[in-house]
C-alpha cells in the first residue's frame, strides 16, 4: 500500500497492516488530528518505508516516549511511534489506496466529546450541501 501527505512531498509504502483498523477517541488524538478521532492501524517496522521526502519529516513528542511524525510543508501527521516498539502507528487516511479492510473498533470512547454524533441523527451529504 502506498500513502502520502496532503501536499505529496512525503511518500511511503506499507507492505501490510499488522493490526485491525481502529478509531482512537483519546484526547491527544483529537487535538493532534483536529478531529473527533484518529483512524489508525499498526504496521511492523520491517513492513514500512519512506519512499520520498523523509528529510521533510519532523516529530513532536505528544506524550512521554510517543513521537508523532508530520510533514513540515503541509502539516499532515503520517505516523506515530514509540521507538522501542516493533511497530509504527499508521494514520489510515494518509493511504492513497483502499486498504481493503474496515475499522473493527472504537477505542478511548471515554474521551468522546459531547458535540460528536455518529448515530445517524444529522443529515449526511455526499459532497458540500446545496444552499437552502
Regions found by a protein language model. Name each.
Residues 1-132:
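A short Gly-Trp-Pro
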Amino acid at each position: 500500500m502506498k500513502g502520502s501527505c496532503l501536499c505529496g512531498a512525503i511518500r511511503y509504502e506499507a507492505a501490510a497492516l499488522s493490526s485491525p483498523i481502529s478509531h482512537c477517541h483519546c484526547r491527544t488524538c483529537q487535538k493532534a488530528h483536529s478531529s473527533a478521532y484518529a483512524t489508525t492501524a499498526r504496521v511492523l517496522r520491517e513492513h514500512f518505508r519512506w519512499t520520498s521526502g523523509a528529510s521533510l519529516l519532523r516529530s513532536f513528542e505528544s506524550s512521554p516516549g510517543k513521537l508523532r511524525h508530520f510533514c513540515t510543508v503541509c502539516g499532515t501527521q503520517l505516523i506515530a511511534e514509540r521507538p522501542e516498539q516493533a511497530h509504527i502507528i499508521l494514520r489510515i487516511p494518509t493511504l492513497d489506496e483502499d486498504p481493503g479492510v474496515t475499522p473493527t473498533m472504537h477505542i478511548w470512547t471515554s474521551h468522546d466529546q459531547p458535540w460528536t454524533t455518529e448515530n445517524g441523527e444529522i443529515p449526511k451529504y455526499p459532497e458540500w450541501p446545496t444552499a437552502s
